[in-house]
Amino acid sequence: MMARRDPKSWAKRLVRAQTLQKQRRAPVGPRSPPPDEEDPRLKCKNCGAFGHTARSTRCPMKCWKAALVPATLGKKEGKENLKPWKPRAEANPGPLNKDKGEKEERPRQQDPQRKALLHMFSGKPPEKPLPNGKGSTESSDYLRVASGPMPVHTTSKRPRLDPVLADRSATEMSGRGSVLASLSPLRKASLSSSSSLGPKERQTGAAADMPQPAVRHQGREPLLVVKPTHSRPEGGCREVPQAASKTHGLLQAARPQAQDKRPAVTPQPCPPAATHSLGLGSNLSFGPGAKRPAQAPIQACLNFPKKPRLGPFQIPESAIQGGELGAPENLQPPPAATELGPSTSPQMGRRTPAQVPSVDRQPPHSRPCLPTAQACTMSHHPAASHDGAQPLRVLFRRLENGRWSSSLLAAPSFHSPEKPGAFLAQSPHVSEKSEAPCVRVPPSVLYEDLQVSSSSEDSDSDLE
């Protein structure tokens, strides 16, 4: 009967009995699998952890209430700095400590050198160092403060100038003193007031407070200084500065023929401002060395100031070279201050023979010296017609030595610029000087002579 029993059934019974015993022995809660059962190659899709699959009972998503904290795989030692680094002893300094020590020793060695330089520049006696070392910091405290500049040692002796510069400065001071000595007290005051101006403002502002204009010479070319009027009407002449610049070339060659003889001057009072005619008869002789042509228009217009100024005028008795053909004439001042001062009532600022360079140039080609007289009417500005101003006429003469002389003639009271013959017959100055036989020379001859001379002078200036 024992042999009839099936061994397979007996084995099944044994397995069941073992499983029942295990279930009885097992705790009520879920148990964690042993670490040997985890496979790191598996990954759970529910929780994302490695070691089990989504079907495994070890997944915390299935047994959420009894989820266990995952155990660490192993200890990670050596990453945390449990023993911090201790500072090295001073007996064995590293390379960085050696560099720091050298940098500290260098400024200590430079301190005495810096003190010596400071004593040399400041001139102060050396201070005794204090025992606690405070003197070194106090002596260089002002270097750290940006309140004042660094003191510079200066000697009481003046620097020695170059002999060439010293001679030049001495000549400038002597020349300035001689010019101031020859001027009137009014001009001294005006020059002293204009000394603070710039070089360009000083030239035009020297005669700003003067009642009469003057011609100042600076260098080789004379400078034309015109006094501006105090009250200028609306219809005044606007082209006067252009005319004054054009006459600058004509007045450049106006020099006395005999430099050692100075003509006597006679004071003449200024006439009242009631007269409204431009009574002028001045002779200006100039050679062919002028840079500007003779046909430069000279325009004059009268501007009546509010208060007429009365003062003496210094006028030469005879013209510079006009006495060779006619009688000497005196310049009369204008009835009012005009903007064309030097062309109507010029006061020539003449220099001494040592200062005036003698330029006596002859014409390049010889022409027959004919004593000619020709009156020409200069262009008149139409804006000044309602002021009662008359056109200015100039009489050109050719002298025996190849020079040309010009005379400023007075215009008649009525307007007749179209008839120069009647004007010459009525002018008293022309009647006195036209006694000699006159030959009329066309204006082209005058223009040709002056054009050739101006071109030759320009070439000479380029060569210099």
Swiss-Prot record:
The stretch of residues making up the signal peptide is: none
Biased segments, Low complexity type: 180-197
Q: What are the start and end residues of every segment in region (Disordered)?
A: 1-42, 69-389, 415-437
Basic and acidic residues: compositionally biased ranges: 74-89, 97-114
Family listed: Belongs to the FAM90 family.
Protein name in the entry: Protein FAM90A23
Q: What is the lineage of its organism?
A: Eukaryota, Metazoa, Chordata, Craniata, Vertebrata
